[in-house]
């Protein structure tokens, strides 16, 4: 397993290099930037600022300079916020991690449990109810679902706060602060779970339906094993093999998918500043966040490969 992980780590290096070049090239060739979009600047001042930030240099030189900065942990300087991009992301990225990780735990738990039960009772009222609920939740646009949840739980019922991370002017600490953040976290997490759990439930259901019809499941039952052991130890582990592949897309998908959710609920995360930077054409911030998503994609696929090799030792042998 150690050699398998080491080989996978070495394979990620050229992918990271290629991803950094593509990201830089896309933003470098995008028309306009923060300086060009500022109509208050004179042509001379705009040229001076481009020289200061190195935007007047050849494309390859700019990429090599940016790559050198990346290797030193420097993502550049935000033109809009006037602070280093790494410092800016560090202020907001952990709030996004909190939102994404809580949503991930909930919708994987719900998706696995509901998908397994639905597969064990195909054609039942529960299976039909799950199918209707899944397709209904997946059919809602993200912004509309978020606004609907705000209308129901915040405006009409007054159960949960509308948005933000804490109450305005709050100076709570300790458990009071934790409970306050949890209350503000509930609605965005609920929105992400409703949007993401449906597809996972369908994948788990389809995979479990295929596995429970296989010969080794009938053999396990014929040996007199308890149904719980057959399902959890034999069927579920094999059904999870194709689902593990989804994990590689879940990490970046949660952050990119939460951009609209963070904006609607005014959650102070990286997705929130990403939209603001997009409107201001603050390319250093956009490049840093996009590179972060690329790294998450590669790390997610690496994690999926490791989990796949752990679940199916034949993968390690073939590799």
Model-identified regions with their sequence ranges:
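An internal, D/E-rich "acidic patch" concept
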Residues: 56-112
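Hydrophobic alpha-helical membrane-insertion segments
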Residues: 16-25, 135-152, 247-250
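Alpha-helical transmembrane segments of integral membrane proteins
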Residues: 2-4, 13, 90-126, 142, ...
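Transmembrane helix irregularities
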Residues: 30, 137-140, 255
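Hydrophobic alpha-helical transmembrane segments of membrane transport/permease proteins
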Residues: 15-64, 153-178
């Amino acid at each position: 397993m150690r050699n398998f992980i080491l080989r996978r780590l070495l394979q990620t290096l050229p992918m990271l290099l290629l991803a950094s070049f593509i990201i830089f090239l896309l933003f470098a060739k995008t028309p306009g930037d923060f300086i060009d979009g500022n109509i208050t600047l004179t042509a001379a001042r705009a040229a001076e600022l481009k020289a200061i930030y190195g935007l007047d240099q050849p494309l390859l030189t700019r990429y090599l300079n940016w790559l050198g900065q990346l290797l030193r942990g420097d993502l550049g300087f935000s033109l809009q916020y006037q602070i280093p991009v790494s410092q800016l992301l560090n202020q907001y990225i952990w709030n996004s991690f909190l939102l994404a990780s809580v949503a991930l735990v909930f919708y994987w738990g719900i998706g696995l449990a509901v998908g397994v039960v639905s597969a064990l009772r195909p054609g039942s009222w529960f299976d039909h109810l799950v199918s209707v609920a899944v397709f209904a939740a997946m059919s809602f646009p993200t912004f509309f679902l978020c606004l609907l949840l705000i209308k129901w739980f915040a405006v009409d019922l007054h159960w949960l706060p509308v948005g933000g991370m804490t109450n305005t002017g709050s100076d709570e600490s300790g458990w009071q602060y934790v409970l306050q953040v949890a209350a503000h976290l509930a609605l965005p997490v609920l929105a992400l779970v409703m949007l993401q759990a449906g597809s996972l439930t369908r994948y788990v259901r389809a995979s479990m339906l295929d596995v429970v019809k296989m010969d080794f499941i009938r053999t396990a039952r014929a040996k007199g094993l308890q149904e719980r052991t057959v399902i959890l130890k034999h069927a579920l582990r094999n059904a999870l093999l194709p689902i593990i592949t989804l994990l590689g897309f879940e990490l970046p998908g949660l952050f990119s998918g939460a951009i609209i959710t963070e904006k609607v609920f005014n959650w102070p995360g990286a997705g929130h500043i990403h939209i603001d930077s997009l409107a201001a054409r603050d390319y250093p911030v956009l490049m840093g966040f996009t590179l972060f998503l690329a790294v998450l994609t590669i790390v997610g696929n690496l994690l999926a490969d490791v989990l796949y090799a752990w679940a199916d030792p034949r993968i390690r042998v073939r590799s």
